[in-house]
Amino acid sequence: MATTMRLDKYLKVSRLIKRRTVAKEVAEKGRIAVNGVTAKPGTNVKSGDELVIRFGPKIVTAKIERLEENAKKEQATEMYTILKEERTDESR
């Protein structure tokens, strides 16, 4: 098991975001923070890190539980814990 992993790869393997290219685009737009700091696609993440991801009007806060190079669909949800999900009003 890896001790660190690129953010874009983690998001894809954990299925928080379905494709690595989409994860990269979201990070490049500044919509992902790791431990309170805006992250780039190549930012290394580790177990215990807290992610905040903005998907349009939705903000998801998740804690990384473990890193896996590959994970089956059933195992992917064990890689993180959702701490909070909230909706925002983007029109404000």
UniProtKB/Swiss-Prot annotation:
Organism: Listeria innocua serovar 6a (strain ATCC BAA-680 / CLIP 11262)
Family that this chain belongs to: Belongs to the RqcP family.
Keyword RNA-binding: yes
Function (record text): Key component of the ribosome quality control system (RQC), a ribosome-associated complex that mediates the extraction of incompletely synthesized nascent chains from stalled ribosomes and their subsequent degradation. RqcH recruits Ala-charged tRNA, and with RqcP directs the elongation of stalled nascent chains on 50S ribosomal subunits, leading to non-templated C-terminal alanine extensions (Ala tail). The Ala tail promotes nascent chain degradation. RqcP is associated with the translocation-like movement of the peptidyl-tRNA from the A-site into the P-site.
InterPro entries xref list: RqcP (IPR025490), S4_RNA-bd (IPR002942), S4_RNA-bd_sf (IPR036986)
Presence of keyword Magnesium: no
Protein name: RQC P-site tRNA stabilizing factor
Spans through the membrane: none
